[in-house]
Amino acid sequence: LIRVRSMPKSPCLNLRDIAAVCVALLCSSSALAGDYQNSPQATALISEMTQDYGFADEQLNAVFADAVRKQAILDAISRPAEKTKQWKDYRPIFVTDARISKGVSFWQEHAETLARAENEYGVPAQIIVAIIGVETSYGGNTGSWRVIDALSTLCFDYPPRATFFCQQLKEYLLLARQEQVDPLTVTGSYAGAMGLPQFMPSSFRAYAVDFDNDGHIDIWTNPTDAIGSVANYFKQHGWTEGGEVVSRATVQGD
């Protein structure tokens, strides 16, 4: 008789482990290929952009083949809104010695540009300096999320504000073409705000200006364009030179 010995436990992966590895590899491949490649939502948006704005199918397919869904962005935007704070609560957060020092340096370095913006748009230099300081600490924190990932995630996977973010995604593709920038390389906040003043794409296209007249609008690395854009934004939103900054509110009824 031939005795068959029981097989020793293999040090290799069992079937369950192999299956898990295969799933992981498939997920990794999907992430590398882009989570929105050939998705119905992306396909519909691509169709709209090609028909309405003359984009090439292959161009946008390549963009969305690289766009990645970011769960961390969905988690961040879904958090309950923080309690409303009064100015006395915000002041120590924003008015710090470090930010004041950076603001003074920024003002001194760009004094001529700030004066020109104030003259052309009627917005005081201190207002422009303060806005850029509050938004990004003078370019120190402009966001590290790829804008294409942020806006694709919020357009396609965040139904509560899909209409808004899909419009921003379309505006972003338009501005990337307009300014001849690679839509896969621009970074910003998790909501898609960009540059020193943290403009959303629609604000960029409506209010950003080429303030140094070099033929290109750059609010990411060019403080001159950022300064002019902030001033224009305020002007277009009704800023009145010499007008009231605050006024006493009156309440009628119960």
Where in this protein do the model-derived segments appear?
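Cell-wall glycan-active module
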Residues: R3-L13, D17-A19, V23-C166, E171-T187, ...
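Functionally critical loop-and-helix segments that line ligand-binding/catalytic clefts
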Residues: Q198
